[in-house]
Amino acid sequence: MIKIIPLLENTTTSSQYRCKHGLSLYIETPNHKILFDLGPNDLFLKNAKKLGVRIQDIDTVVISHGHVDHCGGLGAFLKSNSIAKIYLRSQAVDKHYVKVFGIPFYAGINAKLVKGDRFVFTDEVSVIDDEITLFSNVQGGCKLPKADGNLFVKEDGRIIPDDFSHEQNLIVSSDGTKTLFCGCSHAGIVNIVDKAAQVVGCVPQTIVGGFHLFEPTTKRYEKDEYITMIANELKNRDADYYTCHCTGPMAYETMKKQGLRLGYLSTGAVCKLYE
């Protein structure tokens, strides 16, 4: 069994849990206690306490990419946990920006915190052990979200379009199952699923994460035609899907109407797979 508890997501199952734009998933496997992303601040810690999740027992952290809504809670985590290995792409510590009405705002990680041997920079494919595989550098033919165009990185003093080389994805292998976890799917959720299938030899039975169909700074969704196309492409890759965060509730409903086997994970939900 794999247990998933969103410690922080844009929405909440109850007023007792705080929510904010961002993502932090607690993943419990037979051999690991994993945090997939750390949200924008320390709210995931407060929710974890209410949900009975002991942050000090986390043994593995995966930072999906270097945007603040996924790694802003790093400082708070480091104060609460002294044992976990923290896996990220080396490019995650680059200076990342989001443009709002053409004006760039810093939206990256606090790079000063990334030091010491508990931080591990990952390769294009990194097999950590029998349960955990990380992969990045996703390419593919499926059109990318338009909202990617608002995201940038500073290189040699210039702000240039983000190539998302800092984005990585997690595959958990357990009892003959494969579960794919994505943060924001900037490389395109369809392309990510296809690369996961290349890495592990099959389409994962379950796919969990944000699909980047909603742009938070402008409050705009991708066009319905694009959302419908993504839903139909995912249907062709037979799996169960759980989404959250940057997909947005309207896009979620649109995809559900296409017949995609899709659930939504809000802060405080408890999802048990393969019972």
Which residues are covered by each model-predicted region?
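Structural motif
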Residues: H32-I34, T60, I132, K178-T179, ...
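Active-site metal-binding motif and surrounding structural segment of the metallo-beta-lactamase
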Residues: L43-D94, Q198-T206
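Cap/insert and terminal regions of metallo-dependent hydrolase folds
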Residues: H70, D163-N169, S173-T267
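Divalent metal-coordination and catalytic microenvironments
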Residues: I27, D37, A48, H65, ...
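Short beta->alpha connector loops
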Residues: G39-D42, H67-V68, H186-G188
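Conserved beta-strand hairpin/beta-sheet module of binuclear metal-dependent hydrolase folds
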Residues: I2-L51, D163, E167-F181
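Glycine-rich phosphate-binding "P-loop"
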Residues: M1-S15, D148-P161, H212-E222
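Metallo-beta-lactamase
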Residues: A92-Q168, M255, G263-Y274
